[in-house]
């Protein structure tokens, strides 16, 4: 019903508390369908793919990326082996993957590295990058240490006045010791107040469950202050101006151990 009438996805349904709201209240939110309508109006079609292809995205935002990565198709075998020597534990990502699909955490001590790389490169129906593992700031990592717990901030860039508008924000927390934080892998979301950076909702998932504390670590979710919040917003403002033709974007941020 919520999808048909309001265009709400499963994550919208729980993020916006549709199960507790009246029809008039449900109409106030930017749901999945409205999100895509805004994207069509605000974003230049030719440039949208830059945000969908991880190689293009990483190259375009190289100055802000903050992590090492390598393309398995363009790198030599020697370069790939050197990368894995530097990062014995690494992540493999499909360059067109989303929602956590195609993401694997690899411990090189548990595999034949040469054989694994040969298999990756030979695949004609997929294209992968390798990424270094990140260590995030302890206060966020402690929610779920088995994954990176990202902050999603949605922005709308007013190109005429060169102003970045922040539409909404949420934290995405892993669950069940999975190595990704996405809803589709039982992740937990919680809403963040744009002005203060404080989590203002209970945690929620796609199984209609809500959480005051994380079910594994028991760290309290509601009321948590996101560290470096002003810096997070400043970072997004800089990123928006690097791609002014794609004005409506959901950014995923990781606050690293050193606060960057």
Stretches with model-predicted labels:
Residues 1-82, 98, 236:
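Conserved N-proximal alpha/beta basic substrate-recognition cap immediately N-terminal to
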Residues 44-48, 138-142, 220-226:
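Active-site rim elements
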Residues 51, 55, 72-80, 99-116, ...:
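Domain-scale recognition of functional cores that engage charged ligands
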Residues 58-61, 84-105, 125-141:
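ATP-grasp fold ATP-binding core
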Residues 79-85, 119-121:
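Short amphipathic alpha-helix with an adjacent loop that forms part of the alpha/beta core around
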Residues 113-203:
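Phosphate-binding site of ATP-dependent enzymes
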Residues 203-206, 214-248:
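Core nucleotidyl-transferase/polymerase catalytic module
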Residues 242-260:
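Conserved metal-phosphate-binding beta-hairpin within the catalytic cores
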């Amino acid at each position: 019903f919520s999808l048909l009438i309001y265009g709400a996805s499963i994550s919208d349904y729980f993020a916006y508390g549709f199960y507790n709201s009246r029809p008039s209240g449900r109409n106030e939110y930017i749901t999945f369908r409205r999100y895509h309508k805004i994207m069509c109006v605000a974003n230049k079609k030719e440039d949208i793919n830059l945000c969908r292809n991880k190689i293009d995205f990483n190259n375009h935002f190289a100055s802000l990326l903050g992590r090492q990565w390598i393309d398995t198709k363009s790198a030599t075998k020697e370069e790939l082996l050197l990368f894995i020597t530097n990062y014995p534990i690494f992540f493999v990502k499909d360059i067109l993957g989303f929602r956590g699909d195609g993401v694997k955490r690899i411990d090189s001590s548990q595999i034949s590295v040469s054989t694994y790389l040969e298999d990756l490169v030979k695949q004609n129906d997929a294209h992968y990058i390798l990424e270094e593992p990140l260590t995030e700031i302890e206060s966020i990592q402690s929610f779920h240490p088995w994954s990176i717990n990202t902050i999603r901030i949605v922005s709308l860039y007013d190109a005429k006045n060169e102003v970045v508008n922040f539409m909404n924000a949420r934290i995405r927390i892993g669950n069940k010791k999975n190595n990704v934080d996405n809803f589709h892998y039982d992740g937990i979301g919680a809403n963040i107040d744009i002005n203060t950076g404080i989590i203002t909702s209970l945690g929620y998932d796609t199984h209609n469950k809500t959480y005051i504390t994380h079910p594994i670590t028991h760290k309290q979710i509601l009321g948590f202050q996101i560290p470096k919040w002003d810096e997070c917003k400043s970072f997004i403002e800089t990123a928006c101006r690097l791609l002014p033709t794609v004005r409506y974007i959901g950014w995923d941020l990781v606050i690293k151990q050193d606060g960057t």
